[in-house]
Amino acid sequence: EDDDVRKGLVVGSSDDGYYLDGKFSDLQSKSNVKLVRYEEVLLNATEAYLKKGNAASALTYYNQLRTQRGLTAAATVTLDELKKERLRELLGEGLRYWDLLRWGDPVPYYSRTGATNPANNRTVPNNLFVFPIPQLERNSEYSNVTQNAGY
């Protein structure tokens, strides 16, 4: 959105093939690293409430973030809008890949120049999110565990 205060921080053009380097650029300093930001917590709560079907609670958390960023409060929020907001808010923080996997969305393939070709995008099967359960664990007389799908 044009009035989003974050727009000026990330909109530009570059064809050098490098990714953003901002959140953890100085790993040798003694400053505390922020592992989770409150904005991510708001987005996580929004997503959880949307998935549970509680749109009113989802909208409350979503609008907290929007108004912090100088945007007008939304009347509704959908999962699609949440996905776009996570992209804007958490850009360069290393979370996008995991978001795409969690949502079951294709992971885009980028060339060195940053160009994408949707034909090259990858959908990651669910069994690649979990490890196989060792046979020894499944054979235990106290276990009723079944193998994870795909193994």
What are these regions (language model features)?
Residues 1-151:
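Acidic/polar-rich alpha-helix caps and helix-coil junctions
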